[in-house]
């Protein structure tokens, strides 16, 4: 792939290519895909501006900001660079937005762009559209600001119907403002329709492939994202995020080996970018996939590597807590889960809950339900804090984990009906929403845990139904396959037992020593 960032410039201005600049500096050009963003900046600013747009589309925010500021340095009248700076300072639109300091810097850029006065109405409209995100910044949460940004860019795209970049950014913000409880995925589907047309027109555009993956990052429509997932890493192979993003779709459809491979490449690229946050995020997806294949040795190595990393961002704080937690619970090592150390301090309390949840469930399932009470109380306190902060999404996610942990305490105490009621409530609540984009999946799906509890209660048919329902949202999970196989055996359903044991053996690597795989092979050999 080459970086061919061809721009159709307003006022007939033509800038030098990135390849030329790279050759002059003696460095290889970055392979970031092909984009086209008409602008009226001076020729000497074109290359930096186009590089900034390319990095922006692959969420290379540090590099993008540097490039846009360089465009300003080369042409102090390049007002559209203000739009670029304000846009990259939002950061990942699927996360939590900039700090107040970042917002202040963005507002300064917007004010500069307004003062300069862009040479075209279109450029002035871009600056005003991004300003919609920062209006009344301190008074609104990120979600409300993203909705305003989406509305502004939807109007911009409608007004400039022939502007591909306006259509592409409008689609991104449509998906970013998709409600996690809207199971019709209306905004994401609308975005996908825009992007599919762009994909046919601009197949090497990094943002098109990238945002298609986000638009299809939901269980019911994930397979539609496979073409973009298989293309994106090749479009922008020098961007760590572009190498990671295909695993969002691979995880949704259970392509575990593909997820491991693309995240391994992403980790190498992220280290080269000195981006520990991206390293941790890719590691979380990688360890999740390793554990579905029962590659426990590989997963353990990732756990150890993750312990040496830290980053203040949400995705990395989440990953830093999730990785060792997943390693314990995916292997049903409940005593190990009960002994998990707390994650590093984070400004995001909902990243702490994974460890609390795993410790509580681990203690309850390893014979020490009293030892789980403190962690459940802490989960309840975090729910109160999040509700007070009007962080409804994460308050609900934490409440699911509180209910699940409380269910296993009740179950260990012999209160089976109470336990099953709590566990069903957790599963229903979780199913009503979607996982966050910061995560490959919840620590353990609540409906999968309901299957565990039903199976241990001697209700094999109900357990089988729970596991199969869990597999709809979280396909090809090894624990769900094993649970479904055991439930089928207990229910006397030999055909389904054989099917699920076969799926386990076919999916997991042959050299795994997990006892559940040994049992699967023994069952298949005996029948």
What do the predicted segments below correspond to?
Residues 41-70, 127, 131-142, 405, ...:
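Alpha-helical segment of the N-proximal tetratricopeptide repeat
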Residues 44-48, 203-209, 237-245, 276-285, ...:
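Generic helix N-cap/helix-start motif at coil->alpha-helix transitions
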């Amino acid at each position: 792939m080459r970086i061919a960032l061809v721009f159709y410039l307003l006022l007939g201005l033509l800038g030098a290519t990135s390849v030329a600049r790279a050759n002059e500096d003696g460095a290889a050009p970055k392979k970031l895909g092909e984009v086209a963003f008409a602008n009226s900046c001076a020729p000497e600013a074109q290359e930096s501006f186009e590089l900034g747009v390319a990095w922006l589309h692959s969420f290379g925010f540090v590099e993008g900001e540097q490039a846009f500021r360089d465009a300003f340095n080369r042409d102090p009248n390049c007002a559209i660079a203000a739009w670029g700076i304000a846009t990259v300072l939002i950061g990942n639109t699927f996360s939590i937005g900039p700090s107040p300091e970042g917002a202040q810097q963005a507002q300064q850029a917007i004010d500069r762009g307004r003062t300069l006065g862009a040479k075209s109405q279109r450029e002035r409209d871009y600056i005003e559209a991004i300003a919609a995100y920062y209006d009344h910044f301190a008074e609104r949460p990120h979600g409300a600001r993203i909705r305003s940004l989406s509305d502004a860019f939807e109007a911009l795209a409608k007004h400039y119907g022939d502007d591909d970049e306006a259509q592409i950014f409008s689609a991104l913000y449509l998906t970013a403002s998709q409600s996690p409880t809207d199971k019709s995925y209306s905004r994401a589907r609308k975005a996908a329709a825009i992007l599919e047309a762009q994909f046919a027109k601009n197949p090497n555009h990094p943002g098109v492939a990238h945002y298609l993956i986000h638009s299809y990052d939901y269980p019911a429509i994930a397979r539609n994202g496979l073409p973009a997932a298989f293309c994106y890493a090749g479009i922008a192979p020098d961007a760590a995020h572009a190498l990671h993003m295909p695993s969002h779709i691979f995880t949704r459809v259970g392509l575990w080996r593909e997820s491991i491979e693309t995240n391994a490449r992403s980790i190498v690229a992220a280290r080269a970018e000195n981006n520990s946050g991206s390293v941790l995020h890719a590691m979380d997806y990688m360890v999740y996939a390793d554990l579905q294949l029962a590659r426990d040795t590989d997963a353990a190595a990732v756990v150890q590597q993750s312990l040496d990393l830290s980053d203040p961002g949400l995705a990395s704080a989440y990953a830093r807590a999730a990785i060792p937690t997943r390693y314990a619970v995916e292997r049903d090592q409940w005593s190990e889960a009960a002994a998990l150390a707390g994650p590093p301090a984070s400004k995001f309390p909902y990243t702490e809950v994974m460890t609390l949840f795993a410790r509580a469930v681990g203690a309850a399932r390893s014979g020490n339900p009293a030892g789980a009470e403190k962690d459940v109380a802490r989960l309840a306190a975090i729910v109160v804090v999040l509700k007070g902060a009007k962080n409804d999404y994460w308050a609900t996610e934490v409440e699911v984990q509180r209910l699940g942990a409380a269910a296993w305490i009740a179950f260990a105490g012999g209160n089976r009906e109470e336990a099953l009621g709590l566990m069903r409530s957790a599963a229903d609540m979780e199913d009503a929403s979607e996982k966050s984009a910061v995560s490959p999946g919840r620590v353990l799906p609540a409906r999968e845990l309901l299957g565990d509890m039903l199976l241990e209660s001697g209700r094999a048919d109900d357990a089988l139904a729970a596991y199969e329902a869990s597999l709809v949202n979280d396909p090809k999970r090894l624990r769900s396959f094993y649970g479904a196989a055991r439930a089928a055996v207990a229910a006397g359903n030999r055909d389904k037992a054989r099917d699920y044991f076969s799926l386990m053996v076919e999916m997991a690597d042959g050299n795994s020593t997990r006892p559940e795989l040994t049992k699967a092979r023994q069952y298949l050999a005996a029948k």
